[in-house]
Amino acid sequence: MDLFFGLSLIFGYLAGSISSAIIVCKLFSLPDPRTLGSNNPGATNVHRIGGKLAGFLTLVGDFLKTALPMVLVYKLDYGREASLWVGVMTVIGHCFPIYFGFKGGKGVASMITVVALVISPFAILIIGSWLLTLYTFGRSSIASIVTSLIIPFFGYHFKPELFVPLCALSVVVLIRHWSNVVDLLKDE
């Protein structure tokens, strides 16, 4: 690993630590998303709190903060796997932001952005599986958990060499959904 790639990983984490949800809520004079609704600083909760536009802008912000570091590394000829690792770091930053006491969002939008940028056709399957699971069970948490679990396996089918970073990506999002897993098990 050279110095630039190491710095790119740090930059990815710091970019991911920027909370689009908190910024959008401040711009729209909305309550802090960490204190209302699901208490999660993510696009879904901002949509609940502030409506479609606020939720959409949060989603766009999450996409941009994830995509920009990844595209930069890729354009500098570090390759797909390096770009994926930078994407993993942006998701870690989103979920555990240094600027907000390591209490961030669940990372689903950022995770899907990473997958879409690295393996575009694969993203259609991932988004489709998320939507199908949401439609079937009616809970976004279940859709996010199922999607996180299948990402490494679908990814292995398309790009076996990316299996390890895709596993890392999934583990980060599953860690942030652990309380949802516990709640789902209690309901059964």
What residue ranges belong to the model's regions?
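Loop-to-transmembrane alpha-helix initiation sites
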Residues: 124, 140-147, 158-172
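Interfacial segments of multi-pass membrane proteins
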Residues: 47-50, 73-76, 93, 108-137, ...
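Membrane-embedded alpha-helical segments of multi-pass transporters/permeases
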Residues: 21, 70-71, 135, 152-157, ...
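Short, non-helical or kinked segments that cap or interrupt transmembrane helices
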Residues: 31-42, 100-112, 139-146
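Alpha-helical transmembrane segments in multi-pass membrane proteins
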Residues: 4, 8, 12, 17, ...
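C-terminal ends of transmembrane helices
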Residues: 21-24, 93-103, 130-137, 177-184
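Alpha-helical transmembrane segments and their helix-entry boundary regions
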Residues: 54-56, 83, 111, 123, ...
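Cytosolic, membrane-interface loops and tails of multi-pass inner-membrane proteins
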Residues: 22-55, 178-188
